[in-house]
Amino acid sequence: MNFDFSKLLEPQKAHVMKLMDSLYINGTAVDLSETGTGKSYSAAWVAKHFNSPVVVVCPKVVIPNWHNVLKEFGIKAHVVINFEKLTRGNTEHLSFLNGRDNTPDDYQIHFPKNALVIIDECHKCKGFDSKNSDFLIALKKNHYKLLLLSATAATNPLEMKSFGFATTLHNLVSFRSFVFDSGAYTGRFGGYQIDIGSRQAIEAMANIHDKLFNRFKVASRMTRKMFDKIFPDNRVIADVFDMGTNTDKINRIYEIMERELAELEESSSNYSEHHFAIMTKARRKVELLKVPTMVDMIKDLYDEGISPVVFVNFTDTVDAIINQLGKNNTYSQSVARIVGGQSDKARQADITDFQADRKRIMIANLAAGNAGVSLHDLNGNHPRHSILSPSFSAINMLQALGRIHRAEGKTPCVQKVLFAANTIEEDACRRVQAKLNNLESLNDGDLTFSVRVI
């Protein structure tokens, strides 16, 4: 068979053939390419040549992009739908047996039986018993051909219940032994836990990498280095910054947080839920105290002709930054935003204005703007620098790091992960770096224990 590779960049050609081979041999293929290397274009090429009905399940924010990419390849999808709408079970595409959605066996999927189902950002299916996880398991049980896309499919074996089943790492029944063999153990309250920095866990991730890429040949991955001059330079710096007079306030918040957590451990039977609430409350307060530093950095970058992109965790922080910038007309007319609750039209308008350099500052909520959004320099006039407030989620962080560093970017990128100096965040900085390295152990099979800052 003769294949038309004219719409693909050179590194994508061998990559798509590996995906095609795995779909025919394994029934599943996994694209674990780095962000910005063209996973959607590669998937569309595969769909074009696979010659089956095409279903795309993806985050809502990237639905327009999927329609555009499929159209470029002459494909009209059976449906392009977001996870949340689909898994509610009230569309023609999915229903629940007897109105229940307790297990994957309750999921009645109504896609064409010979459909190729593309799951974009498949890390959204990593939950142990989430709806998305059950949906992916149901797809595999119903023998659909699956093309899974994510730069960050999972950080550890506990997140591989559905992913591992789809890629035959386990058969669900063997999931318990799969995670225990990978270094997991039963925690204080009965759930599974794992030390992702342990030698056993790191070796397990390397073994999983070997199975996916070499033994099963179910996965393929493109890196930015493969694209030579197509990608600009990219420097990621995780560092601590002086928060000035707010440093003492930040330390005080963390002291209160630690005391509340200690009291909770002694008194609460529902430790996990309250633990998360206490942590979130403290992080929200601390992030607001970083706003003056972030605003100063934004202004400095803007004045240098750079277009800054700022990723934060809370809408309160987005509002505070925009309010501070709004006090000066130089900056107030140039601010774009990506936040939860924003209409699709307003969000896309701001992204378009930023990409066209009509707006020069982008403030994004990490949860809303970390996946599927392109914010790279298309024109060569205003290099992109990002400022990231750490989320302590390696997946969110790595996805955000791929927003300004993408194929065909015209200028080098600098990305700074912002930690507060002289606080316990100095330890958190090292933990985040460790998580980012552990993601690479899934993608690159890196056995080293080193912390790497690019």
Tell what function each PLM region has.
Residues 1-30:
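Conserved pre-motif I regulatory segment
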Residues 35, 40-72, 154-159, 313-316:
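Conserved Walker A/P-loop ATP-binding site and its immediately adjacent core
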Residues 76-83, 172-173, 309, 326-347, ...:
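Conserved RecA-like helicase motor-core motifs
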Residues 76-96, 355-372:
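Conserved two-lobed SF2 helicase motor
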Residues 116, 133-227, 409:
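Conserved P-loop NTPase motor "coupling/switch" region that bridges the ATPase
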Residues 120-121:
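Walker B catalytic acidic pair
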Residues 224-327:
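Conserved helicase/translocase motor-coupling segment
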Residues 318, 336-428, 435:
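Conserved RecA-like P-loop NTPase helicase motor core
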